[in-house]
From Swiss-Prot:
Transmembrane domains' residue ranges: none
Gene it is expressed from: ureF
Region annotation (Disordered) ranges: 68-93
Protein name per the record: Urease accessory protein UreF
Organism lineage: Bacteria, Bacillati, Actinomycetota, Actinomycetes, Mycobacteriales
Domain of life per record: Bacteria
């Protein structure tokens, strides 16, 4: 498989990694009245790309380059994820990615990542095995950070799929520039609003999405 084909495959929302059950906080944002239409969804997605997307992609790129060992990357992710609920969501998605990766690269030492690695840690190892550049790996993570929340909002708000697709096209340049920044070095930030939404979501009864 070529590098481009590998990149497109990893960005495919149909991959059986469990990512489809996570809304990236947009369900709670909708419940709180912060996201109500396409315009407010755009603002939410921009915020998520510039914070969670940037941080996750930067740690994954560092793992891919070999600048961070898995245990160090795990600690760096925890330090940038104050919300326990957000950490749990990250580890759930990381475990799902490793489950798939074991089937694709069975010869790799996946046990070194631990039982429930953060998504960034698992993605960094996958990116290295797939032969992706740090820039391409970062772009894949930033892009799926955006599209996961966009798709969830489309379902929850019954938005026109075409309108949401147009919005994701419009945000593609932001994804590209954010990925380029992430590939340079570790991003050191968090977003209190997104952390609060994640925690409230975990404490709410019967949410539709896992996060």
């Amino acid at each position: 498989m070529t590098t481009l084909a590998m990149l497109l495959t990893l960005a495919d929302s149909r991959l059986p990694t469990g990512a489809h059950v996570h809304s990236g906080g947009v369900e709670e944002a909708i419940t709180a009245g912060l996201v109500t239409n396409l315009s407010s969804l755009e603002a939410f997605l921009k915020r998520r790309i510039r914070s969670h997307g940037l941080v996750t992609a930067s740690i994954a790129a560092a793992v891919q380059r070999g600048d961070l060992a898995p245990d160090g990357a795990d600690r760096e992710t925890d330090a940038r994820t104050p919300s326990p609920a957000a950490r749990d969501a990250s580890r759930s998605q990381g475990r799902g990615l490793v489950r798939l990766a074991r089937a694709i690269w069975p010869e790799a030492d996946w046990d070194a990542l631990g039982a429930k690695p953060h998504l960034a840690v698992a993605a960094g190892r996958v990116g290295a095995l797939a032969g992706l550049t740090p820039e391409h790996l970062a772009l894949q993570l930033v892009y799926t950070t955006m599209t996961g929340s966009a798709t969830a909002a489309q379902r929850l708000l019954a938005l026109d799929p075409t309108d949401v697709a147009v919005l994701t096209f419009q945000l593609s340049e932001l994804c590209t520039t954010t990925a380029a920044e992430a590939a340079i070095g570790l991003a050191d930030l968090s977003d209190p609003l997104l952390d609060t939404l994640a925690q409230h979501h975990a404490e709410r009864e019967r949410p539709l999405f896992a996060s």
